[in-house]
From Swiss-Prot:
Name of protein: Large ribosomal subunit protein bL27
Region (Disordered): 1-21
InterPro entries registered for this protein in UniProt: Ribosomal_bL27 (IPR001684), Ribosomal_bL27_CS (IPR018261)
PANTHER family, per the entry: LARGE RIBOSOMAL SUBUNIT PROTEIN BL27M, RIBOSOMAL PROTEIN L27
Annotated GO CC locations: cytosolic large ribosomal subunit
Domain of life of the native organism: Bacteria
Family: Belongs to the bacterial ribosomal protein bL27 family.
Record organism: Aromatoleum aromaticum (strain DSM 19018 / LMG 30748 / EbN1)
Molecular functions per Gene Ontology: structural constituent of ribosome
Disulfide bond positions: none
Amino acid sequence: MAHKKAGGSSRNGRDSESKRLGVKRYGGQFVLAGNIIVRQRGTEYHPGENVGIGKDHTLFALKDGTVQFTIKGAQRRRTVVIVPEAA
């Protein structure tokens, strides 16, 4: 009787799906209210003027304007600001 021995099983072969984090709109770019600027885990970037923060720490524009990245305070925090266009 011709038989084949059972093949071994691998304990590898799985990986988590990428979360697509990072900066979505860069300094100098024009954004509309509601546009996502940064997707992040924790507050790598902090919200400044005209920028809101979601429960997953996503930063988004509250007003139409130009994105600006600044470093503020004694802690040298990276802050995202929206400079509204002159009306």
